[in-house]
């Protein structure tokens, strides 16, 4: 029966060619990436670029999503922790996803389930018959059970029928292929015992029926017995433990139970089956539970010292904001965001300008402010070469060149680059002026216009020059004033190359050129 188990596994391995329908390029690229050596490159730069190229060929980030790439990495680790023979068998089938991997292992278990039951029934029958027949066996007559050991490069052994002798030859003779030679006919018909019993009925009712049958009584009275040749009890316990833990990877090799070989192979395989890291235990446990809840369970009779008990991993849910401001109750996803927000309540401005001493809440605000002193305009238009201090200003300017005007007024047909510009324009048709001054009752279409107007009543001048101390109501007025101190003249005449601080000065200057033409 053990021969049948080995044949079933070999037949399953031979079916690998049937599943070779998937593209194997992914496996080839994976092996190239894992096996790449530093000595294959001329230097660190070339080695890094080569690894990057091989990784992209394997994972294909432009074609796969993040979840698909993670699935590939988890599948690779899952195959790595499998026993070597099972890993090789699964890779031969080229599984394309986790469902396929789990399905392949389940199919192998189902295919080998019947041979496993046959081996168990055979062992139980020998245990029942051995005490009765051992006393009547000739001294030189021994029926040796074939050795069970971890599947390796074992030769395929065909299933043969065993003849039960009456007087028996001196010993069982095995051929070169491990095939048992047939005994002579004992001279009377022998009953055929059906060994294919289900696991549920291994203790009842077939045992009682077998003991009460007439044929069995004749068999027991004919001085026929069996003797199991086992070297020692330790090998027997190792064999049973092996069959319990790995019932689907045993095969037939040799003609006796070889205790040292069995023990050596078992210890090697047991050492290979290491507990994966905790972060992988959670993902692999979820993978197994989704496909088959019983696949990842530890066998009842196994003596594993540390069974796989994955611990739940706490993850942040999307949109979760655990950091709460104690002053206003506003929540943030990151602690750094909460720290920056709390500076609004405390009035802290840790970032100071070294030129004028002005302080800012954020470092980005300080960086933009320093461009006023340096005159830096890092964002340049590729069409007209005009430069800007902010990227958003450049994007809005580029729309004037591309004529990208997606916002159109339905009243007059005029188009705008920004939705806010269209909204302000619509107020000219409706005459709407929702923003009203409470001091004089004057109304305005824009909130900014109302804010500037209210400063005439309060005499507020919030924009102060750090060079001379002069204050202004509007920020643009301060910017123009600062050009006096910095000497900046951004408006240049295209005819005579003369520069001006204000656009109005450039326009008035250009009139002189036009007068000469007239």
Curated annotation (Swiss-Prot):
Pfam families hit by this protein: SCAN, zf-C2H2
InterPro entries according to UniProt: SCAN_dom (IPR003309), SCAN_sf (IPR038269), Znf_C2H2_sf (IPR036236), Znf_C2H2_type (IPR013087)
Chain positions covered by the region annotation Disordered: 292-325
Keywords for this protein: DNA-binding, Metal-binding, Nucleus, Repeat, Transcription, Transcription regulation, Zinc, Zinc-finger
Domain of life from the UniProt record: Eukaryota
Entries under PROSITE patterns matching the protein: SCAN_BOX, ZINC_FINGER_C2H2_1, ZINC_FINGER_C2H2_2
Polar residues: bias regions: 292-304
Protein's name in the database: Zinc finger protein 449
Origin species: Gorilla gorilla gorilla
Gene that encodes it: ZNF449
């Amino acid at each position: 029966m053990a021969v049948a188990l080995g044949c079933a596994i070999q037949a399953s391995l031979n079916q690998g060619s049937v599943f070779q329908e998937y593209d194997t390029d992914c496996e080839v690229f994976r092996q190239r990436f894992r096996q790449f050596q530093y000595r294959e490159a001329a230097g660190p730069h070339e080695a890094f670029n080569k690894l990057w190229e091989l990784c992209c060929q394997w994972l294909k980030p432009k074609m796969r999503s993040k979840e698909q790439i993670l699935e590939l990495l988890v599948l690779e680790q899952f195959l790595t922790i499998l026993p070597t023979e099972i890993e090789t068998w699964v890779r031969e089938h080229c599984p394309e996803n986790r469902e396929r991997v789990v399905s392949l292992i389940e199919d192998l278990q189902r295919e080998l389930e019947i041979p496993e039951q046959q081996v168990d029934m055979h062992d139980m029958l020998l245990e029942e018959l051995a005490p009765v027949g051992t006393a009547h066996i000739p001294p030189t007559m021994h029926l040796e059970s074939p050795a069970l050991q971890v599947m390796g490069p074992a030769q395929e052994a065909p299933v043969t029928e065993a003849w039960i002798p009456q007087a028996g030859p001196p010993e069982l003779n095995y051929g070169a292929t491990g095939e048992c030679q047939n005994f002579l006919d004992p001279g009377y018909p022998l009953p055929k015992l059906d060994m294919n019993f289900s696991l549920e009925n291994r203790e009842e009712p077939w045992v009682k029926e077998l003991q009460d049958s007439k044929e069995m009584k004749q068999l027991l009275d004919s001085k026929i017995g069996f003797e199991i040749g086992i070297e020692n009890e330790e090998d027997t316990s190792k064999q049973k433990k092996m069959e319990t833990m790995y019932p689907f990877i045993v095969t037939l090799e040799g003609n006796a139970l070889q205790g040292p070989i069995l023990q050596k192979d078992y210890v090697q395989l047991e050492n290979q089956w290491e507990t994966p890291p905790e972060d992988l235990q959670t993902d692999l446990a979820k993978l197994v539970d989704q496909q088959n809840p019983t696949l990842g369970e530890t066998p009842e009779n196994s003596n594993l010292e540390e069974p796989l008990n994955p611990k739940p991993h706490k993850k942040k849910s999307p949109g979760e904001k655990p950091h709460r401001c104690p002053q206003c109750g506003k929540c943030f996803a990151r602690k750094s965001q909460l720290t920056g927000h709390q500076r609004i309540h405390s009035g802290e401005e840790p970032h100071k300008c070294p030129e004028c001493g002005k302080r800012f809440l954020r470092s980005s605000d300080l960086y933009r402010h320093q461009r006023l002193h340096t005159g830096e305009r890092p964002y340049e238009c590729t069409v007209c070469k005009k430069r800007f201090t902010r990227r958003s200003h450049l994007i809005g300017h580029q729309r004037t060149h591309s004529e990208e005007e997606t916002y159109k007024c339905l009243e007059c047909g005029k188009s705008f680059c920004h939705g806010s510009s269209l909204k302000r324009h619509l107020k000219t048709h409706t005459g709407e002026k929702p923003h009203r001054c409470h001091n004089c009752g004057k109304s305005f279409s824009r909130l900014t216009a109302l804010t500037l107007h209210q400063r005439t009543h309060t005499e507020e001048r919030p924009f102060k020059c750090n060079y001379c101390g002069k204050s202004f109501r509007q920020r643009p007025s301060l910017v123009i004033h600062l050009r006096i101190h910095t000497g900046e003249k951004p408006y240049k005449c295209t005819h005579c190359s003369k520069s001006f601080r204000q656009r109005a000065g450039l326009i008035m200057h250009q009139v002189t050129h036009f007068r000469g033409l007239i």
